[in-house]
Amino acid sequence: SVLCCYEFYRIMRLDGKVPNEFVGLVASVLFPLSVLVDPVWLTVINFLLVLLLGLWYVKNPRTRIADVAVTAFGAIYTGYMLSAIVLLREAISGWEGALLSIGVCASLWLSDSFAYMVGSRFGKHKMVPKISPKKSWEGFFGGLFGSVVVWIIIWWTGLYEINLWFSILCGVVVSIMGVFGDLLESRIKPVSYTHLRAH
């Protein structure tokens, strides 16, 4: 999480933002680690992050609200989001919890693979061409199918107390969140490309 957060801040600096890297990077590490101790600490870390960034903003007149926002977003986007998979792993003890975490990742991987295969072969209707020109609705539904297949397999194992419809819903949600993450990343990447071309 700290490497991802650092890279995000590097890109934002190319765009003229000045994040507080120390506070943001520390928060990005503490978010997933705090879950291992007690999920309540997530709230504490959130509070401290807002408090420290508020003090930074008040103390330094040159600090812009955009710098504060970028610092907070970087820590949340990387560390806080990563803590979700840690929470999932800790929710179920033993190897079943580890297997479920791997299953979530596998559903994302298969979703991406099916989206690429279906989209590259049948993709004609673009989702958001201005942000991600190669993403199509055909690929999106192919990705949904791939993710749902993994979750049906998870249900079929009988290791978890979930029914078929809930497993299908999980597959759909994971796939949609994966697409959202891809689009968000695609929205961020042009910042670095633009500045690299300029140099």
Language model feature labels by segment:
Residues 1-136, 140-172:
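Membrane-embedded alpha-helical bundles of polytopic integral membrane proteins
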